[in-house]
Amino acid sequence: MKKNLKYYLKNKLTNKDLTFVPSSFDVVGDILIFSEFPRKLSKKEKVIGETILKTYPHIKTILKKTKKYSGKFRTAKLKVVAGEKRKEAVCRENGVLIKLDVEKVYFSPRMSSERKRILQLVKPNESVLVMFSGSGIYPLVIAKNSECKEVYGIEMNPIAHKYALENVKKNKLENKIKLFLGDVRKIMPKLNKKFDRIAMPLPKGGENFLDLSLRYIKNKGIVHFYDFLNENEFYKAEEKIKRVCNQYKKKCK
């Protein structure tokens, strides 16, 4: 958005109310999502939503998060503030189209640059595994934009998996992507396969699956592990990795 949202609301809200207007939001396709919407503006949310719709015609639905990410699928509750009463979106990222329900499937558009970084690291003929593959965004961008041999994806959320299957077909990548529904601890042993690269894009609790990734990574393979920490706490992630590597007698760097 070219100008700060407050600029377009200055004639519709009091100066005091303007100070509470959220400055950050996510856009997934034609849906705009406020992660944090102040209670003090609850009576003004319709005005704010309608203003966004009039100012930015490409936005069709405004949502606000009413419950933070929770549960085993890490999903959030969302409320329609203005516009079309739907939560399903189609967006384009790194050359692929992806369809999903933003309330029923975990998806972070803010990780787009990270997904691009990963795909640029993939070498020709690599076998890649994406644990917790969601609606398929990681397998899709890797398969579409790299010379990998294949990408496997495992997801426990049946709704996300259903979207992933549809997205693979939509992007005509059936020949490079193989998707599995279920618990990674049950699926991975059945694959009877090791990988050159394993991505673990789990927003919370990834350390509980590090042991699994180390068992199925090839020698000199690469595991992409994620942990959300403050800058002065990065050492904690390193300690988690080293502890598991030592446990399984793996060299890591």
What are the language-model segments listed below?
Residues 1-253:
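SAM-dependent transferase fold signal centered on methyltransferase-like domains
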